[in-house]
């Protein structure tokens, strides 16, 4: 796994605006995607993730014009997802300036597309997004966990967290690695928008089950939550939205805090680091 930990702001986009919700529901406006992307890039974000969160549910492609506008104002790696079902969708996203393509619903419905994307664009371009939620109806063949006296397993959800699949998240993570995914974007639906910390049980379980990089997502409300996920799991990157969108914390200040607490992060923007070489 990579030594330097990455901090990744996330732009969840609906109707051309950045939004944020709670458990994938109760969506509210959080700003302009182009302005926020530029701000995060300048503050030293390592990468940016842009997710068109209603594309799959609405059975349409990602808003390409907006992807192009965001790509023009940043100089950091850029992952885009939402509504990717066929290779042409991925090609269009990459041609608009994205460096990586994230696929979730499309991969569950047609797992072979992961291999096809890897063969066509390279493993480094393929990010499989896994949205997982606790299911307390335990059954044979699932990875069972216990917390607060209750047993559960992690179920994969699709269509923006609206539909359960019956897939065990840990087993699905192993499968997507086998099929050729270069990275996993792992989001806890239970923790999404709560601002009370990442799901350490889910994150550690998936990280320990695969060899490819994993990005932790869902629940970050303060810098200490990032510190916790880096100290208590071997996750490669921490993604956050709320703490950055509402200006309670800036990317550079969060990274300074992590550095002060012995987490190896890259300080300074990509542009400023390049200027020093």
Language model: regions and residue ranges:
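Glycine/small-residue-rich loop that forms an oxyanion/phosphate-binding "nest" at active or ligand-binding sites
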Residues: 63-125
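Conserved, mostly hydrophobic/aromatic
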Residues: 12, 40, 48, 80, ...
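Structural preference for beta-strand elements that scaffold enzyme active sites
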Residues: 6-10, 47, 75-79, 100-102, ...
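Charged helix-capping and loop-helix junction motifs
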Residues: 61-68, 111, 166-170, 196-204
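Conserved anion-binding
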Residues: 13-15, 19-20, 98-186, 190-191
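C-terminal helical cap(s) of enzyme catalytic domains, especially alpha/beta-barrels
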Residues: 113-120, 230-269
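Catalytic cores of alpha/beta
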Residues: 74, 78-100, 201-238
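Glycine-rich, proline-tolerant flexible connector loops at the mouths of alpha/beta enzymes
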Residues: 47-66, 105, 185-196
